[in-house]
Amino acid sequence: MKQLILLFAMLLIVCSCSDEILNEDNHQAILGASNVTFSFDSITSNGNWKLCSFKQKFDACQIPDSLLSELTTKELVELCASHPLNPICYAYNNPMDGAQYIMKNFNGFKELQKREDAAEQLLDFYEGIDFINVTNSPYPISLKGDNNKVYSGSNIQFIELILASGELPSLYNKTNMERLDRVSYNKFEQKLVRNDTYGVISLSNSLIIQSQVALKSNKLTENDRGIIRNFYNSCGGSSDISTISKILYK
């Protein structure tokens, strides 16, 4: 009987989880007098967060409709970077599939896609990430961006997958693509400097961005294009990174 009562109590907690976390008052409590108009912190710090199902957590992380249009593009980029469920990308055989799930279902990214300055702000954010002065290395690592804001390694990996995804077409106009090529190469070099910290996955992410740029620019030979296309489609799983880097950086 005691076991049944305990089980019933646990079910009540889980069932009430989404109601408590999704409560509009909870979202409004996140608002403050600072420039930050939305944050995931108050959602994930809720005592019931760990008891929620994945769907309940994902629903809880949606930005209230009343706030979406009020957020700046920079804030939307930062929210995409700090989404608490970003690590699920690497629960998929192909991490891009996980990233696509978040991009297609998170209303913050959908709003970002509508912004004319989305590509510029995304590039500004990524360019501001310091891959050399890493904290909490070797794992889990934390990386600093502009204004010394701290992001987990998985947060930045998600941004790299966005940059490579093709979901923001304006990233691939001539001006932005040249900048994306330059910035992603610089970040790859920064990671190589800290080869005691960054492994194959992180290095592959840089090369996946570079692969997308190379495929869009039509500068590859037919044979190289096939190799790079396979590398991109497998999200880094089809070839070793030394082979890919030799092709991309000829």
Residue locations for each model-derived region?
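C-terminal motif of bacterial Sec signal peptides marking the signal peptidase cleavage site
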Residues: 13-16
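Non-catalytic all-alpha helical scaffold/repeat segments
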Residues: 25-250
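Sec-dependent signal peptide recognition
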Residues: 2-7
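Bacterial signal peptide processing site
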Residues: 18-20
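Generic cytosolic/nucleocytoplasmic N-terminal low-complexity/intrinsically disordered segments
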Residues: 1, 22-25
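Residue-level signal for mature regions of secreted extracellular proteins and peptides
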Residues: 10-11, 228
